Amino acid sequence: LSFDFSTVSLTPRGTPASADGILENCLSGYLENAFLRVAARESSISQRVGYEYAAFQALGNYVQWPAIQWCTDSYDPRFRSWYVSAASGPKDVVIVLDVSGSMRNAGRMDLAKQAAKKLLDTLTDVDYVGLVQFSSSASTALGATTLLPATGSTVASMKQWVDGLSPTGNTNFVAAFDSAYGLLRDSSDYSTGCSKAILFLSDGIPTSWTTDNRRRVKQQGQALGGNFQLFTYALGSGADTSVLKKISCDNSGALWTVADGGNLADAMADYYTFLAPLQRPCQVRWTYYNDWSSGMPLLAACLATFKKDSPTLPTSCGGGTTGCMPELLGVACMDVSLIVTQVRVCSMGGASQSSSQPSSPSLDRPSLLC
């Protein structure tokens, strides 16, 4: 650990000579110097800032102060709760998993479970979450009839529920969407009031699907208002992309196709990049999270950054773009001294806690700024 230097971790996931690689390397160098300047102004060792760090969206490059030597191949900052919370703001998320008989093939059920658990790890205490499994019929995680706050205990229980899923039966899209929409519709008292999203995964062709079914799904989405989006994920060679594409495009979303054995977890966890442009710009997010290496609880003040002149975001709909939406560039954070009380921090707009950090029963849920 060195307080005289910053660490720049270049990801193995991209090409350094690409346009994204060159941009992220340049910005990493700038932030490396900026972090050192901030640290130099902190005279008190006991009350100085903690870590300063930033990560970039395109490749996942990461820079932090103080410098530390570590192996980062397995660490992707873009799916850490501090990053997603700052990028997307508070959100209501329903994850829908196909557990029909065909999910036994090519290890698809294991991929779906890994993806669902990775999604849960991106949430914080200001988010609300629901889980639906479907085959011939559909049911919700933990028997919930509304969304649940994404606290540490809720997330842990949902992960256990996911681990217990087993594939069997047919592929009933109608039952799945009715359950997912029901969670969102009946959660007026259990909602952030901000972005809403359904993440729908299937590997097969629906047992029955008509024009009326499509109209029903679209109307239920429209009833949720302008902050709702529906994202679909087609897993494997048997997935019906035509139906999933129409469903997502009817609801301001996007379709991802993932081959058998592909990185489904990263594809599904990337949903927040479409929510990011909807949040209030220049809004600092206060987030408790557990340090990746030490497991210690930390408090971070994070700010998402966007490209000023960015191209439109690609989707699978219409002409292939969503329209003029700012592109997420990355997130920069500073850990605040932990002598700051929880009460003081939670009185600030946008405060949140990582799903891995249990919420304090003595504190009210913080006020939210979308």
Regions found by a protein language model. Name each.
Residues 1-91, 252-253, 260-263, 270-370:
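Intrinsically disordered, low-complexity polar/acidic regions
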Residues 17, 21-32, 87, 91, ...:
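Soluble non-cytosolic domains of exported or imported proteins
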Residues 34-40, 71, 78-83, 105, ...:
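Eukaryotic intrinsically disordered and solvent-exposed regulatory patches
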Residues 37-59, 87-151, 173-181, 192-202, ...:
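Von Willebrand factor
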Residues 102-103, 204-208, 339-341:
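Short acidic, S/G/P-rich loop/turn micro-motifs used as interaction or catalytic elements
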Residues 107-111, 129, 165-170, 175, ...:
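VWA/integrin I-like adhesion module and closely mimicked acidic/polar interface patches used
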Residues 117-125, 163-166, 181-189, 222-223, ...:
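Sec-exported extracytoplasmic/periplasmic mature domains
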Residues 149-153, 164, 189-191, 211, ...:
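Surface-exposed intrinsically disordered loops and tails
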